[in-house]
Amino acid sequence: MKKNIVFCFFAVAILSSLFADHDIILAPSVGYTYTNAFTVKNPINPSSENIDYFKAHNGYLEFTVGVILDNGFTYIEDAGFAAGPAYVTDSQMRVPSFFFISRSLLGYTFKPTQNLYINLLTGLGLTLGYPQVLQVGMPVNIGLFCFFNKKSGLNITATDMVGIGFPSFLTNAFTVKIGPIFRL
């Protein structure tokens, strides 16, 4: 029992010293996401007649939580919902679409001034939704956080996630968002 207490004490001490100088950020945001994908119906003959294209233009609501360390290392988790029309170009069908998008991002934050942060992040992303069922990809994120005081500011972010989907083959999801940001 004493070993567990000592281990927990040292684990808390090490973690608290690791994250001693950091910013925890919370950022709800709204934006736009464009998702496209294509599926080759006949892999033996990949002509343009054998390819289904899917395009979705969606409104987007997202919530972001992250840690920005004093040395610039950044870890961000974000999750959002998108809804809007989707188009299947071969049959020219318009269908409703909705997606859940989640990303885990690591990278670096440049701090040119005390209240201006520029993020360059990458990681792993997942999209679940209708009519495209699943996308697993690698997002690239560029963000600008401009704080007006010690605790609040403006978040402007663009993310592009290229990946492999099911039932689609290659997929791409581009998102632009804006919203308030809070620094704890």
Regions found by a protein language model. Give the residues of each.
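Short helix-onset patch at the extreme N-terminus, typifying the N->h transition
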Residues: F7-C8, P28, K150, T159
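Short glycine/proline- and aromatic-enriched beta-strand/turn motifs that initiate or cap beta-hairpins
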Residues: A20-D70, T74, A173-L184
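Transmembrane beta-strands of outer-membrane beta-barrel proteins
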Residues: I25-T33, I76-G84, N119-G125, N155-M161, ...
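Detector for outer-membrane/organellar transmembrane beta-barrel domains
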Residues: G31, F99-L105, Y117, T159, ...
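Outer-membrane beta-barrel translocator domains and adjoining extracellular loop/strand segments
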Residues: F38-S47, Y87-V95, P131-M138, I156, ...
